[in-house]
Amino acid sequence: MPKPTKGPRLGGSSSHQKALLANLATSLFEHGRIKTTEPKARALRPYAEKLITHAKKGELHNRREVMKKIRDKDVVHTLFAEIGPFFADREGGYTRIIKVEPRKGDNAPMAVIELVREKTVTSEANRARRVGASKQTAPVAAAAAPQAAVEPEATEGPDADDSSALPEAEDTTASEASRSTETDDPTQDSDADKS
């Protein structure tokens, strides 16, 4: 039994509304984002999300159900091969509506509807990793602070620190320079062998 849709009918008749939503969904899946009026974007959102849910299941029956609404086989293939698997871990909320400035000609409220391309699981994991890393560095920094306070007491006078630090710095730069020349020589020999 046909049931009426909520809200105002877009386009006048039910057949026009079905065709309008099918064309909007086709454009959305083809381009990833489209600019349309706000009421059309709000009507398209549940329509497109149901189609993406069918694509996530990926069975033949689901493909046929989507083909009833979207007639472009290339777009249906993109939906089932790329968009559906991309949202496999996500339970809804596949689209986002962003309001933009009104249309210049008739001042109609406009919006951009787009597919959400961020992975929420990975962003949450990255955030948790950063929080864990900052918690680990805080105790290490706290442990290093008492050691730094002990070291100046062990040495006698500022002149002893400066004189001992300079020769060590010169030794490290000399050893680094010798390492860099050693690594450069084998590459030159291998270049000579090739030619």
UniProtKB/Swiss-Prot annotation:
Segments for region (Disordered): 125-195
**Known PROSITE patterns for this protein?**
RIBOSOMAL_L17
Gene Ontology cellular component list: cytosolic large ribosomal subunit
Bias regions of kind Acidic residues — which residues? 153-173, 183-195
An example molecular function term from Gene Ontology annotations = structural constituent of ribosome
Q: Which GO terms describe its biological process?
A: translation
Record's compositionally biased regions (Low complexity): 136-152
What are the protein's UniProt keywords?
Ribonucleoprotein, Ribosomal protein
Listed under subunit, the entry gives:
Part of the 50S ribosomal subunit. Contacts protein L32.
The similarity annotation says: Belongs to the bacterial ribosomal protein bL17 family.
**Record-given protein name:** Large ribosomal subunit protein bL17
Q: Which organism is it from?
A: Mycobacterium sp. (strain KMS)
